[in-house]
Each structure stands twice: as structure tokens, then as C-alpha cells.
Amino acid sequence: MADEELEALRRQRLAELQAKHGDPGDAAQQEAKHREAEMRNSILAQVLDQSARARLSNLALVKPEKTKAVENYLIQMARYGQLSEKVSEQGLIEILKKVSQQTEKTTTVKFNRRKVMDSDEDDDY
């Protein structure tokens, strides 16, 4: 029991030291990511109404790549002034349909039949 507690304390102390004396570029990079995420959230809060924001957060749990595409689309529309009012849930559904159509993958099935030597023609009776 004492060994486990000692090991936990060592890990905690090591984590503190790494955080304190860690790579300064890493901390700056994390700060930049944090600021970017904060900026995205503030723009989306201005552009989306409450129900659309809830739908987008639910979608983020299931399909994060599609959510990122929709967020980028909304931010781009907001920057270019193409949104005259807040996007409702129905508007978000329409945008989701557009993004789905653009990223839709078509699957094709290709049959590769084996060519078998037919020995019926060569039968000598």
C-alpha cells in the first residue's frame, strides 16, 4: 500500500515538474489552440440560436469531422456577411444536408469474376 502511494506521489511530482519546466513552445502552442477554440465558440454563439447550437453539439459527439466542416462553413459565411440573422435549427439542418451532399462518398461494387478453363469443349468421347 505504501509503495502504491509513493509511486502515485512520484508520478504527481513528475507531472508538476514537467508542467512547470516543460517545453515553452508546447505551452505557447496549447495557448494558441485554446484561443482559436475560444474564438470559434464566440463566433458560433453569435451566429447560431440555442436549438441549433444544441444540435451542433450533439452532432459533435457522433461525427466530429462533419461538425468541424459545418462550423468552418458557418464561420466563413459569418466573416463574409452572408448571414443576416441567427441560424435556426432548420437552417442548420439545411446546411448539414449541403455539407453531406458535398462530402458524400459513392460506393461502387465491382465484380471480378475468375476466368476458369472450361474443359467441356476438349472432351474426346
From Swiss-Prot:
The keyword Acetylation applies. The modification N6-acetyllysine is found at residue 63. Keywords: Acetylation, Apoptosis, Phosphoprotein. InterPro entries: PDCD5-like, PDCD5-like_sf. One of its GO terms (molecular function) is DNA binding. GO terms for biological process: apoptotic process; cellular response to transforming growth factor beta stimulus; negative regulation of chaperone-mediated protein folding; positive regulation of apoptotic process; positive regulation of gene expression; regulation of apoptotic process. It holds the Pfam family dsDNA_bind. The modification N-acetylalanine is found at residue 2. The modification Phosphoserine is found at residues 51, 119. The keyword Phosphoprotein applies. Residues 16-36 are annotated as: Disordered. Induction: Activated in cells undergoing apoptosis. May function in the process of apoptosis. Belongs to the PDCD5 family. PANTHER family: PROGRAMMED CELL DEATH PROTEIN 5. This is Programmed cell death protein 5.
